[in-house]
Amino acid sequence: MIIKRFKQFKEKYGKEAFKKLNEFFQKEEKIFYENKIRELMESQGLSEQEAAIKARQSWVATIGGKLEKIVEILIEDFCKEYNLSITNDKVLKRNNLPKELDLVKRAILVDFGKYSLLPDGDIIIYKKTNGLPKIIAILSVKNSFRERYTETPYWKLKLLQSEITKDIKVMMITPDKDSQLPRPY
């Protein structure tokens, strides 16, 4: 339901939708809490306070995955306009990938000697050039900046160690709801 409502929200606000994300999330959080608290009180017989605590935990788990999809929706028009493709690390971890996605996977693998790992890549943007994917950017989408601020720079440093991956842009996308990032003046 959140994704469906976000698509309607994006239709309403168009290219300016990203500027109103906090407004969207606040409204969604309120709807989610009201429904979840009522559901937990009725189904599990919890007090309102106990249900509120569980509802908050449930919201955090729910919104994390939804945020990735919302960012994808926000950038899909841009990607179409510039003939870019999108995938993610969950897709790339699957077996028997189509050739194009297998090439994307191989283009971002970080070599640790005896093994290789995929960097944290909630959204991977690439362009097909002469039948081969050129990785443009890896986006790490985090609902909360706290305690995760080192993951994205770590992967960028690892990608810099190879001539093949050194030019890949690595970015973290966050609504920074905890106001952990300094604000520009």
Across the structure, where does each feature detected by a protein language model lie?
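Aromatic/basic-lined ligand-recognition segments
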Residues: 106-115, 119-121
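Acidic-basic catalytic patches of nuclease active cores, encompassing PD-(D/E)XK
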Residues: 45-109
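Nuclease-adjacent, charged terminal/linker segments that flank catalytic cores
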Residues: 1-58
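Conserved catalytic cores of phosphodiester-cleaving nucleases, focusing on short active-site segments
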Residues: 123-125, 136-143, 152
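Arginine/glycine-rich "motif VI" loop of SF2 helicases in the C-terminal RecA-like domain
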Residues: 158-167
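Domain-level recognition of nuclease-like catalytic cores that cleave nucleotide substrates
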Residues: 161, 175-185
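Short acidic, S/G/P-rich loop/turn micro-motifs used as interaction or catalytic elements
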Residues: 142-148, 177-180
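Short, solvent-exposed loop/turn segments that connect beta-strands within catalytic domains
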Residues: 83, 129-134
